[in-house]
Amino acid sequence: MANSKQAKKRAGQSEKRRQHNASRRSMMRTLVKKVLAAIEAGDKEVATKELAAATPTLDRYASKGLIHKNKAARSKSRLNAAIKAL
């Protein structure tokens, strides 16, 4: 438990940041799942459209440090390869 005023403030800030990041991470995962669902359905046109929506989000969160830049690159690459294989 926080013993000082500064530690209490930092604990509150950390919790607020954790909730904010969890929301963003959830949104990002949902966008990726939409692409995967379109790929599973075999709908190349919808999958391409969904990937176009997910790509800037992955890049944005990689630049902000929410996910590692290599994870963003790997995700985009694998999704794109799966779409091309349709």
UniProtKB/Swiss-Prot annotation:
The keyword DNA-binding does not apply. GO terms for cellular component: cytosol; small ribosomal subunit. Transmembrane segments: none annotated. GO terms for biological process: translation. It comes from the Bacteria. The keyword Flavoprotein does not apply. GO terms for molecular function: small ribosomal subunit rRNA binding; structural constituent of ribosome. Residues 1-27 are annotated as: Disordered. Keywords: Ribonucleoprotein, Ribosomal protein, RNA-binding, rRNA-binding. Gene3D superfamilies: Ribosomal protein S20. InterPro entries: Ribosomal_bS20, Ribosomal_bS20_sf. Belongs to the bacterial ribosomal protein bS20 family. Binds directly to 16S ribosomal RNA. HAMAP family: Ribosomal_bS20 (MF_00500). This is Small ribosomal subunit protein bS20. It comes from Colwellia psychrerythraea (strain 34H / ATCC BAA-681) (Vibrio psychroerythus).
